[in-house]
């Protein structure tokens, strides 16, 4: 089966232990999570999980359905890279003496539109925002010059490229149902 990198976006209420429940769905199916980012969403009280994993379409559909069944999950959807806009951030700690001695290092940093955010006599810190591939390529080119001391990257953050936000519609529908039930109780 062909494996594709899928991004699952989960919206949930903010309850302790839910992250463990969500990751357990992947563990039970022996699917490795490539990146995981959890943060507050644009809706108060709702958190957004952005999870990436390599798998096939049938498996990602099953995983998404299992996650959706969790009590505190409002909704979960999976996407391919052409259905989302995604970004990461990376920090590269490089040796300042090599940065000063080899002009290629500065050229590579400029080529990838990265920026130097800290410089001292021992090391410099380079920051790169962008697509996963660009971040990896910059790392590989800097590593080839033997100047990388440390490297760290964030998990993927993503938004859908569709014209609507599914969670907003879901919450509006949920609120309308709640109000109707309250009105019926008042009758």
Where are these regions (language model features)?
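Long, contiguous binding/interaction regions
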Residues: 1-48, 57-187
């Amino acid at each position: 089966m062909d494996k594709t990198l899928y991004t699952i976006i989960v919206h949930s209420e903010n309850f302790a232990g839910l992250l463990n429940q969500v990751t357990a769905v992947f563990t039970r199916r022996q699917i490795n999570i490539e990146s995981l980012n959890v943060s507050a969403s644009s809706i108060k009280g709702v958190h957004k999980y952005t999870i990436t994993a390599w798998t096939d379409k049938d498996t990602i559909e099953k995983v998404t359905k299992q996650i959706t069944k969790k009590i505190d999950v409002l909704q979960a959807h999976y996407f391919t890279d052409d259905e989302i806009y995604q970004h990461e951030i990376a920090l590269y700690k490089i040796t300042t003496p090599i940065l000063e001695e080899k002009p290629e290092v500065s050229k590579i940093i400029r080529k990838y539109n990265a920026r130097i955010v800290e410089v001292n006599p021992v090391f410099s810190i380079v920051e790169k925002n962008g697509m996963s591939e660009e971040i990896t390529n910059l790392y590989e080119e800097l590593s080839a010059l033997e100047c990388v001391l440390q490297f760290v990257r964030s998990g993927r953050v993503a938004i859908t490229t569709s014209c609507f936000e599914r969670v907003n519609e879901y919450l509006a529908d949920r609120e309308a149902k709640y109000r109707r039930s309250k009105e019926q109780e008042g009758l």
